[in-house]
Regions:
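Short glycine-/aliphatic-rich beta-strand segments at the starts of folded cytosolic domains
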Residues: 1-18
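Short, conserved charged micro-motifs
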Residues: 20-23, 62-64
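Acidic, low-complexity, intrinsically disordered interaction modules
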Residues: 21-51
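Short, compact, well-ordered microdomains
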Residues: 45-71
Length: 71
């Protein structure tokens, strides 16, 4: 699943947690704190689509992010 948010310079994608933890991947990690919905996610810039991509381990986490930040 991937969501491109209209008017925002990013897209949101779901990536299995096991894939996020690959040591061969180098990404910046940040902590998202939205009240009780604090989640870990991964950020990468995709040159092909020229957007920042936020990777989440579950669809639910991605949707929570989309609902909060697509406003």
């Amino acid at each position: 699943m991937a969501l491109t948010v209209p008017g925002k310079p990013y897209t949101i994608a779901v990536k299995p947690a096991a894939d996020i933890m690959e040591e061969s991947e180098i990404f910046d990690w940040v902590q998202l704190n939205i009240g009780e919905y604090g989640r870990d996610y991964e950020i990468s810039y995709d040159d092909e689509i020229e957007l920042t991509v936020y990777y989440f381990p579950t669809e639910q986490q991605a949707l929570l992010f989309a609902l909060r930040w697509a406003q």
